[in-house]
């Protein structure tokens, strides 16, 4: 269901697209931070609500009645998950440029849109621009981290080499969707060309993949070294699971998703080995801390279900060898003993 007024602004240059689900506590602050942007150009705010049942829809309707000239609502009949919610909302947006904002984040400055759009308007070779942000603890309000610097090959190259940098995490932090603005036409072309990534979102959580791959293949990334957005850190989120095993499987899903991307784009065996070697080292470190080496080995071996060839089998053999996992097992046991002793001493 789409709720929009006939008074909705005509020909917006940029659309702020907000994806939300059961975030009634935060959504008004998010929406208002977008509606109150001070811009010399027309803009709209499009909210995609993914089947909320916590009173969020009623709140959004009241806001839409008050700000009918700028606010458009899209209510999904059922929960579609984050990626498909964004795809649907962006398709309904009318702006040349799309700025995305998660339902619990918000803009810190009134000219965030002006700064983001200015980069795209004046740099045709840039497909996506993102800015700095700070993360804060939702319970205490304490600022946890301030990020106003971004270094990556993605600033200078496009195409396969840019995607390689993306998949290898070749940057100091992942581009934050809530501080990003990009060209709508490139995104929609990517949704057709790389539709497999949308389908994979039903299996692996990684809503930024279809966006970042599409943008990296078509242009360079831009960056604004200023705090534009506040990123809220919650106790529970899509990344939060009841057990450490569930959490590890979730994290390892990103490794599998990267392999799917590499296969889809016909990466060379050397590129695939580079991606997997880097990401598996990260997962091994996670497994050590959580004492989940057996699960790590099982997940690494499951990569054959995606692609079974000489390269993958070599990667599996090298990353599950005794020389790799034995030191990890020992460290994992030491971490567990240390954690146990801490609990005993607290009592």
Where are these regions (language model features)?
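Catalytic core of nucleotide-sugar-dependent glycosyltransferases
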Residues: 160, 203-204, 227-235, 240-270, ...
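Short aromatic/hydrophobic "clamp" motif used to bind/position activated sugar donors
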Residues: 98
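A conserved acidic beta->alpha catalytic loop
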Residues: 49-58, 78, 102
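Short, acidic, metal-binding catalytic loop of nucleotide-sugar glycosyltransferases
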Residues: 32-42
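Conserved nucleotide-sugar donor-binding catalytic segment
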Residues: 148-244
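Conserved donor NDP-sugar-binding/catalytic core segment of glycosyltransferases
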Residues: 111-146
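N-proximal low-complexity "stem/linker" segments adjacent to membrane-targeting elements
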Residues: 1-33
């Amino acid at each position: 269901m789409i709720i929009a007024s006939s008074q909705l602004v005509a020909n917006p240059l940029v659309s702020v697209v907000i994806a939300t689900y059961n975030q009634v506590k935060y959504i008004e602050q998010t929406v208002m931070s977008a509606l109150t942007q001070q811009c010399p150009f027309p803009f709209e705010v499009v909210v995609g609500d993914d089947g909320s049942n916590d009173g969020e829809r009623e709140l959004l309707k009241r806001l839409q009645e008050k700000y009918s000239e700028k606010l458009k609502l899209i209510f999904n009949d059922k929960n579609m998950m984050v990626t498909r919610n964004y795809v649907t909302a962006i398709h309904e947006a009318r702006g040349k440029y799309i700025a995305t904002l998660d339902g619990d984040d918000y803009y810190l400055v009134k000219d965030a849109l002006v700064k983001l759009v200015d980069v795209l308007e004046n740099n045709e070779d840039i497909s996506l621009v993102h800015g700095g942000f700070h993360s804060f603890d939702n319970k205490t309000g304490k600022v946890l981290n301030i990020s106003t610097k971004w270094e990556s090959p993605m600033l200078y190259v496009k195409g396969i080499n840019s995607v390689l940098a993306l998949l290898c995490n070749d940057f100091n932090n992942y581009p934050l969707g809530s501080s990003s603005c990009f060209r709508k036409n490139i995104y929609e072309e990517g949704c057709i060309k790389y539709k497999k990534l949308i389908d994979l979102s039903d299996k692996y959580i990684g809503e930024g993949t279809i966006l970042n791959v599409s943008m990296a293949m078509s242009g360079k990334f831009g960056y604004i070294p200023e705090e534009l957005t506040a990123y809220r850190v919650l106790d529970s989120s899509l990344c939060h699971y009841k057990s450490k095993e569930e959490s590890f499987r979730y994290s390892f899903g990103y490794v599998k998703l990267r392999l799917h991307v590499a296969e889809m784009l016909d990466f060379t065996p050397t590129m695939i080995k580079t991606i997997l070697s880097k990401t598996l080292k990260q997962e091994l470190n996670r497994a050590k801390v959580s004492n989940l080496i057996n699960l790590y080995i099982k997940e690494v071996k499951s990569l054959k279900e995606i692609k079974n060839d000489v390269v993958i089998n070599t990667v599996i053999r090298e990353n599950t060898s005794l020389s790799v996992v034995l030191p990890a097992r020992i460290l994992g046991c030491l971490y567990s003993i240390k954690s146990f002793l801490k609990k005993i001493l607290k009592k």
